[in-house]
């Protein structure tokens, strides 16, 4: 009996000193005055030495049993992290020193290991919404958890909150379906939302008879003084045309071809940002009101919160360039989309891709600012993938708080040029 006892006495200290395996990808969350800052944490281990990245910053540190210590530095600040770690979680403190003022800020942090892709093929989800939201908020509880490669079929209410039966379910203002939580999506990733199908699910839509002030000079404003009334349209879903229910004599034979689109596709905004209303737009997407977001297109959005938190809504039976009368043909919609994820790819402004074009969406309080954002966004895209210069510009949005400009480039002009870098999508 003495030999087995001696054996255990020898190896027990070695087990107690074993290093925790921390290599891999983590989601780190720092509590900064009650505001959670979420970042991708990537760790590499060589003995007791750590290296890797936290967000965009390189890190160096050490691992001592269950103790972890690392430091990050950039041009503006340095941060020192100390904590304890298990195989799948971390807790600790962080001290940040401002590079200019030398002010010290104390905070706490936690981290959890990012799970692996689940086994099996992508899934299709049927989601029936019961609640709709009027902000692109990171604090709203996700309605459904999905994985890259999954497809979701759902419905949206119209801009006034009415569903396919005409029942008002929520206050107006572009109420959204969602948010959908995408597993393994981390800040710094790129979310690809493939619009598989957009189907009209009722036979009427609402619009207006006026023109938005941004597009009106003083002479036209006088002529429009008696406008501002709602106009109802009949949607012929067989012939895919629309007619006014009560047209004037001049418009009695007027028809509009239908091209269903989504006015809103957005994700939750980033750290310390107030949740924007669903009438707003920005780098997170949102109420872009771009008539190129149709069946067969793909919307690319920067992930800024864990899980991305995707919202969709504001279906239009058809919309012209600019939504000049404040509303398109507003209606409810059946929506089907598939999610992909491109890890660690940064874009400054939303992108839309069709079978024939790549399009950078610029959004700003002025048309000039939106034009600059679209040009910069396209230049970034072409620099990343093609190293070419932009060509065509289309104004997509003037009705809301932010104007929008879409810079569009035909794909056939890019065919002779090889991609500078191949985008890697997360395995499905």
Where are these regions (language model features)?
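Short, Lys/Arg- and Gly-enriched loop/turn segments at beta-strand edges
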Residues: 159-170, 198-208, 307-317
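Conserved mixed alpha/beta catalytic, RNA-binding, or beta-rich assembly cores of soluble enzyme
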Residues: 258-287, 291-368, 379
């Amino acid at each position: 009996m003495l030999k087995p006892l001696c054996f255990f006495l020898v190896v027990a200290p070695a087990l107690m000193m074993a290093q925790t395996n921390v290599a891999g990808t983590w989601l780190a969350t720092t509590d900064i005055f009650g505001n959670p800052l979420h970042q991708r944490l990537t760790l590499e281990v060589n003995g007791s030495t750590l290296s890797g990245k936290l967000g965009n910053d390189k890190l160096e540190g050490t691992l001592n049993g269950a103790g972890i210590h690392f430091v990050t530095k950039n041009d503006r600040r340095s941060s020192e992290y100390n904590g304890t770690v298990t195989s799948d979680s971390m807790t600790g403190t962080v001290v940040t020193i401002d590079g200019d003022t030398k002010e010290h800020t104390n905070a706490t942090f936690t981290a959890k290991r990012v799970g692996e892709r689940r086994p099996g093929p992508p899934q299709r989800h049927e989601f029936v919404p019961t609640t709709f939201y009027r902000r692109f908020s990171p604090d709203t509880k996700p309605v459904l958890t999905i994985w890259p490669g999954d497809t979701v079929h759902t419905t949206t209410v119209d801009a006034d909150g009415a569903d396919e039966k005409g029942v008002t379910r929520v206050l107006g203002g572009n109420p959204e379906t969602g948010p959908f939580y995408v597993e393994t999506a981390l800040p710094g990733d790129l979310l690809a939302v493939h619009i598989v199908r957009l189907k009209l699910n009722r036979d009427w839509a609402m619009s207006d008879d006026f023109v938005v002030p941004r597009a009106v000079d003083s002479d036209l404003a006088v002529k429009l003084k008696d406008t501002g009334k709602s106009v109802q349209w009949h949607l012929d879903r067989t012939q895919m045309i629309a007619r006014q229910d009560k047209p004037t004599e001049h418009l009695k034979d007027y028809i509009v071809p239908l091209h269903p689109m989504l006015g809103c596709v957005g994700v939750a905004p980033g750290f310390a940002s107030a949740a924007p209303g669903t009438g707003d737009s920005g780098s997170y997407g949102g109420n872009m009101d771009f008539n190129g977001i149709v069946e067969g297109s793909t919307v690319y959005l920067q992930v800024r919160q864990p899980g991305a938190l995707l919202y969709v809504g504001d279906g239009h039976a058809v919309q012209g360039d600019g939504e000049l009368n404040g509303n398109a043909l507003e209606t409810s919609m059946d929506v089907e989309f598939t999610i992909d994820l491109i890890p660690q790819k940064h874009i400054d402004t939303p992108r839309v891709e069709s079978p024939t074009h790549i399009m950078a969406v610029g959004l700003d309080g002025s048309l000039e600012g939106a034009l600059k954002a679209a040009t910069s966004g396209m230049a970034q895209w072409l620099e990343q993938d093609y190293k070419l210069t932009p060509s065509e510009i289309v104004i997509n949005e003037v009705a809301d708080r932010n104007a929008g400009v879409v810079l569009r480039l035909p794909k056939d002009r890019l065919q002779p040029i090889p991609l500078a870098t191949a985008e890697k999508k997360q395995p499905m």
